[in-house]
């Protein structure tokens, strides 16, 4: 299920550890970081709101929803992994990579939701959607647990060693996402 992959991104990158890394290490000012993080999320959602209807129509008309979903997945994987290169003071790079990855995430949501009518009936759509959500939630927690040992290295003014460990968090998420997304994209 695509939610198994997606929830790793939202739990670790958007909500918990990378948001903490961005504020503590990259920006260094929690208030400024929260402000920037909120703007980054808003910008990515506005981009998706503008282009999703157009891309959705193209995908429906051409029958290539799965290809568009694959592009969104590759966007998330590549730009999440690229967050590894963001260090102290690299606010613009960190925010730009996050915005692009989040566009991939939000865009993927548009396409994945369009598959539900084709794989369910009116009677079981709610149940199937609930199972999908539960599997995604559990997967997000699993990925968070995998990254949690690295979280202790998220510190203001980290040593080079601490920084190198904390920077592995988005790499773990990108690899986890890549493995989890294989099944829904192939079948």
PLM feature spans:
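MFS 12-TM fold signature
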Residues: 73-80, 136, 176-180
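Helix-loop boundary and gating motifs at the non-cytosolic
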Residues: 1-45, 91-95
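Hydrophobic core of transmembrane alpha-helices in multi-pass small-molecule transporters
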Residues: 73, 79-111
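Cytoplasmic helix-loop-helix junction between adjacent transmembrane helices
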Residues: 97-135
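Glycine-rich segments within core transmembrane alpha-helices of 12-TM secondary carriers
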Residues: 48-49, 126-151
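C-terminal membrane-cytosol helix-exit motif in multi-pass small-molecule transporters
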Residues: 143-156, 174-187
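Cytoplasmic membrane-interface "Motif A"-like loop-to-helix N-cap segments
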Residues: 59-75
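Central cavity-lining transmembrane alpha-helices of secondary-active solute carriers
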Residues: 13, 17, 34-58, 78, ...
